[in-house]
Structure formats: structure tokens, C-alpha cells
A protein has these predicted regions:
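Charge-rich, well-structured scaffold segments of protease-associated domains
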Residues: 1-2, 20, 31, 75-223, ...
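Residues that act as N-cap/strand-start positions at coil-to-secondary-structure junctions
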Residues: 12-13, 81, 234
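Short acidic/glycine-enriched loop/turn segments that link adjacent beta-strands
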Residues: 13, 36, 94-95, 246, ...
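N-terminal cap/recognition module
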Residues: 47-50, 64
């Protein structure tokens, strides 16, 4: 039976109100009175692609709350806990996301702590050494796992091992990370030119003035920070041997384009058909028919300057080659045969429903707003993307697969006990 269609008219997303502060920062507001909570998100272009020393970007972001001019790390944590406030840091290749969430009635005390964290960090030497030692140990343990290693070598195969999106650093580089490295990155990147602020939840004029006053204190730089981005240098196949591994970790994919490309949404549909939900083609094949894996996934991944399609699975070592062959077979089947309308209708509804789930609540809307702002668009693109999803045809899915998923363009990375290259 054909799935009932979920229409774009069911998704209405408010546009953020922009205020430009005297120091040039864009302050975006998404007011909602549904809940007595609010969140402030500061987004800095200060991700790992911008760092001059290995691990400096993540260390700087995570050390912001480890002591300030007027408060110790413990005092910061206790003050936030006392008011039920929440502080979160996320770091990716391009950006650092720093968020403060609180009940509306405790906004004032939370903002005071936010000012200490954002404007007065000390990066204490003893806290830094403890942080580096802990992260070094964690990374050493993680790199014993085939899934961690394949993620790193797949990035290297896509972009090249010197590219900001492909480079990995040895654990020992934590030993040479210094307080001066963090202070230098902080001064260079945590500036007004490098920042935008998004507020969501129950926000009145008083709260908005307080947020604006804090953001206005961020220093200005001579110019916006830039990074060296060489052209990616892809490698078709990478293998790392782990003789004792009982499972192999696999990645298959290719470089494509960023979210602003006209075919990005269509390729999101292609990725979902292949491995974006439990009943996807790769799940039915590798898990359902063959029992090679408990799970396999596919997705389009977007960075600021590049994007790619990736397929990921972990399979038994003895079925590494057969599993890869089935991945290639499913890609080829999508290229060769138009998919059934009923299957595509299900995929459309799953994708539209996921958008609606993400947008359920002020903070989810704020997250999507941030993503759109960083891509140079606004929230109007959400409805447009849903229209694209709902209007795509089996012929269009096949056209995209034919155009972008040629076998000779695919990049494969494997970590495991046996190299399957000559069997695939």
C-alpha cells in the first residue's frame, strides 16, 4: 500500500530576528513562550581546521570553563549546578559551539558565569596538563578500536593526510600542547568577527539586552580568521591491518559537495535509500539476508567547504570481502533499476518526519537555524528542501546514482585482520 504523503505545509519554521551589535556580531533571536527555558549559543569559527597546533582547537574550547579570572573550575561548575543551568561545548572541523541553557528565572546568574567562561578564561597549567593526559589516554584506547581507525583513514583517503579535514595527529602531540598555544588560538579566533549568537526560548527585552551586552564585550580583530585549504587529494583504497580483530570496519563513499549544491538534497534521498533507516536496502541485504552485520548506515556529511557521501558498517572478519561486494551491488542496483514508488514514498515520509522531529521545540529550531546561517541561508530553505524531498521521482534518484556513484569514483577504507582488496 502506498504511504500517505506528509506535505510541506505541515512544517512551519519561524525566521530568526537579527540584530547587528556595535562590534558587528549578528545576534539572532527565536522567541518562544511555550517553556520557561532559554538557551544562548555562541558559534565561533574556531574548529580544528583553524588551529596552528595539534589538538589546540578542542583543548581551548574545553578548557574555557576550567578556571577564569574570578572563578575556579569548581566554582563555575557549582554555580551552574546550583541554578540547574547547563553548559555545553561541541567542536567540529570548522566551528566551536558554546551553549548555556537555563530556566528563565535563573538567566541572570547563568549569564554572569557565561561572561567568566567566554571573556576571562585563564587556561590554568595544571588543569591543561590533566586534560591533555586524560585525552591522550582516551585517544590511545579509542585507536585500538577498528571503527576509530577506519574513520580516520577514510578521512585521509577522501581529503589527503595534510588537508585540514583529513589530518590525524599522534597521541604524543598532547605532550607538546602548551598554554601559550591555547591563549594564542583564543586571542585569534574568539573574536567578534568570528562569532554569531543565537538565542532561543523565553526571551524578553531584558534578557536580550543582557545577551547583547555580553556579546559586545568580545574583542574585535584586525580581520576575520582564515585557514589554508589545499585541494583534496583522494586515494581510492586504504587498508590498515589489525591481526587480532574479530571484526572489520568498513567505509565506502566519495567526495561530493556542500549543502548549498542543488543536488545535495537529492543525494540525501539516495543515501537514505541505501542506508538511512532500519529498512534501508543495505540493512535488508547485509543484516537481513546475509547476517553480515548488526547495522549499516549511509549519510551525506557536510563541512563548511566540502561534503561527502559515506557508508559505514562493521562486519565479521571472515565476511569482509562479501560485505563490500554487497555494498557495491546495492549501489549498482540503484544505478541500474528505478526504485519502486512505494519504497520511495516511505523514504520521503521518513525524511520529512525526521525534519519535523528535529524541529520539535525551540532548541531544535535554534540548532537548525545555526546550521542554515553557517551555510549562508535562512529557515526558508527548510520548506524548500522538504518540497525537493517530496517531489523527487524514481527516475531522478536513478539519475543521481548514475551521475555520482560510479564504481571508479568510490573510495573504500578497511580496518581488520585481512585485506580484502583482491576479492572485491
Amino acid at each position: 500500500m502506498t504511504q500517505p504523503r506528509i506535505t510541506p505545509s505541515q512544517v512551519e519554521v519561524a525566521e530568526a530576528r537579527r540584530t547587528t551589535l556595535p562590534n558587528g556580531i549578528g545576534l539572532y533571536t527565536l522567541a518562544s513562550d511555550d517553556f520557561e527555558v532559554l538557551r544562548i549559543s555562541f558559534v565561533f569559527r574556531a574548529g580544528s581546521s583553524m588551529q596552528h597546533a595539534p589538538f589546540a582547537a578542542s583543548a581551548t574550547a574545553n578548557m574555557l570553563s576550567e578556571g577564569s579570572r574570578d572563578m575556579t573550575a569548581r566554582q563555575i561548575a557549582e554555580r551552574l549546578d546550583f541554578h540547574g543551568s547547563y553548559f555545553e561545548v561541541n567542536v567540529d572541523r570548522d566551528y566551536v559551539y558554546i551553549s548555556f541553557s537555563s530556566l528563565s528565572k535563573f538567566f541572570g546568574p547563568t549569564l554572569e558565569v557565561a561572561e567568566q567562561i567566554l571573556l576571562q578564561p585563564l587556561f590554568p597549567e595544571d588543569e591543561l596538563r590533566a586534560y591533555c593526559e586524560k585525552r591522550k589516554q582516551t585517544l590511545t584506547i579509542e585507536r585500538r578500536k577498528v571503527d576509530t581507525v577506519v574513520r580516520e583513514i577514510f578521512a585521509e583517503a577522501l581529503f589527503g593526510d595534510k588537508h585540514p579535514y583529513g589530518i590525524s595527529y599522534p597521541e604524543k602531540d598532547y605532550d607538546t600542547l602548551t598554554r601559550a598555544d591555547l591563549e594564542s588560538l583564543y586571542r585569534r579566533l574568539y573574536t567578534a568577527e568570528n562569532c554569531l549568537v543565537v538565542c532561543s526560548g523565553r526571551i524578553g527585552e531584558e534578557e536580550l539586552q543582557g545577551i547583547g551586552a555580553l556579546a559586545e564585550k568580545l574583542p574585535r580583530a584586525d580581520r576575520s580568521a582564515t585557514a589554508d585549504f589545499p585541494a583534496p587529494r583522494s586515494e581510492a583504497y586504504r587498508f590498515v591491518e589489525r591481526p587480532d580483530a574479530v571484526q572489520s570496519s568498513l567505509r565506502v563513499g566519495r567526495l561530493l559537495f556542500t549543502r548549498t549544491h542543488p543536488d545535495f538534497v537529492g543525494m540525501q534521498v539516495v543515501a537514505t535509500v541505501l542506508g538511512g533507516y532500519f529498512g534501508s536496502r543495505l540493512m535488508q541485504n547485509l543484516r537481513g539476508e546475509h547476517g553480515y552485520t548488526y547495522g549499516v548506515g549511509a549519510a551525506m556529511v557536510n563541512f563548511e567547504r566540502e561534503g561527502y557521501l559515506g557508508i559505514a558498517a562493521q562486519v565479521g572478519a571472515e565476511v569482509t570481502a562479501p560485505a563490500l561486494r554487497e555494498i557495491y551491488n546495492e549501489i549498482e542496483r540503484l544505478r541500474r533499476e528505478p526504485m519502486p514508488e512505494e519504497e520511495l514514498s516511505l523514504v520521503k515520509n521518513i525524511m520529512t518526519g525526521e525534519v519535523m522531529r528535529i524541529l520539535d521545540g525551540p532548541f531544535g529550531i535554534a540548532d537548525v537555524t545555526i546550521e542554515n546561517l553557517l551555510c549562508g541561508t535562512n529557515n526558508g530553505v527548510i520548506e524548500e528542501n522538504i518540497r525537493r524531498i517530496q517531489s523527487i521521482t524514481p527516475a531522478e534518484v536513478q539519475r543521481l546514482a548514475v551521475k555520482y556513484l560510479r564504481r571508479e569514483d568510490l573510495i573504500t577504507a578497511v580496518v581488520g585482520a585481512v585485506d580484502p582488496k583482491h576479492e572485491i
